[in-house]
Amino acid sequence: MKKTIALILTIAMAVATLTGCAGTTVVIGECTCPCVTEDSAVAPETTPAATEAAPEVAAPETASGALKTGLAVSTNISKSVSATAEAAGAVEYDVTLAAVTVDDNGVIQSCVIDSIPATVNFDNKGVITSDITAAVDTKNEKGEAYGMVAWGGAIAEWDAQVAAVADYAVGKTVEELKNGDIDMTTGKAKDGSDLSSSATIYLAGYVYAIEAAVNNAQHLGAQSGDELVLATMNGVKSSASATAEAAGLAQLDADIAVLTRKDGVITSCYIDSLQAKVNFDVTGTITTDLAAPVQTKNELGEAYGMVAWGGAIAEWDEQAASFARYITGKTAADVAGIAITETTKPADGSDLASSVTISIGGFQALIAKAMQ
């Protein structure tokens, strides 16, 4: 099975569906979770709250102990700057991810939070100076290398601090979370609170992300006691320098899966993808509205245009939901063994091919990573 999963991960590097330069996998059982810095955690007043528009899926019948699975994605590009003669231009991405399981009373049962930081630099001629083939690690994946302790003298590294916040959220409703140890005015843990001893970074943005994930949660098959996993594959290799014929492009591709599992079997799954594009011209001037919301493919829905412009049998969000539903109840080996064509589309005549016609090799790689 390990050889098969390794093969699928290799295939993903060549598949356009999911970019996959780097990423992370976080697993939560009774919630030992990872969570944003003050820069990336922005309240809804300044950055649109993460409103992950969940595609319509046929949810399994609920049963005693049934939980809802939710994901929220919020992207901030407001710190991006144009190039000048004195300083390079930079498109700065900070993507906050929150995943939860929640019961029908709104009580959070498990929580994972992560963040994807990425930067694409370019000069005042619109030429990219960054290595766009370099890995794009999440903050949890960076761990100590993120440098909050070494360079900032923090009491703990970013991943440890956000893990404390995610742990704190478990067993609470959103309202209880907002009215507990976190001062939603200052955004910090209240002085003297238990949380203040383990988390000193700005936290309010993470609370908003958790709230969005709870609001987006739906019954997809998760049960009490299942492990919650958040996995990503990220890259900026689609970026391109500006020319006389075409605008420059900084593009962060982030492919995201949240799933629950028990005894090696997927019990619920939700997949989304982000293509965050910022254009600049041959003078290094950014031409994209940095205040405009950056939506995921699920949030775009019909506006993504696969049906209208490509004549697809269904929109991207519907096909991703169909794939997620299809693999629920399967093991990692089952998913890796799904029959595909040379272009990694579902094999002709298969059950999956009737609802999914996009390439799924990247999906398989993402799930393989989540199930490691």
Residue ranges of predicted features:
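Positively charged n-region of N-terminal signal peptides that target proteins for export
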Residues: M1-I11
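N-terminal, intrinsically disordered, polar/charged segments of Gram-positive cell-envelope systems
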Residues: V26-S64
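Intrinsically disordered, low-complexity segments enriched in glycine/proline and serine/threonine
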Residues: I5-A6, A41, P48, P55, ...
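Generic cytosolic/nucleocytoplasmic N-terminal low-complexity/intrinsically disordered segments
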Residues: M1-K2, P44, T138, T296
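C-terminal motif of bacterial Sec signal peptides marking the signal peptidase cleavage site
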Residues: A16-G20
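Active-site- and interface-proximal helix/loop "cap" or "latch" segments in soluble metabolic
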Residues: A63-Q372
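Bacterial signal peptide processing site
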Residues: A22-T24
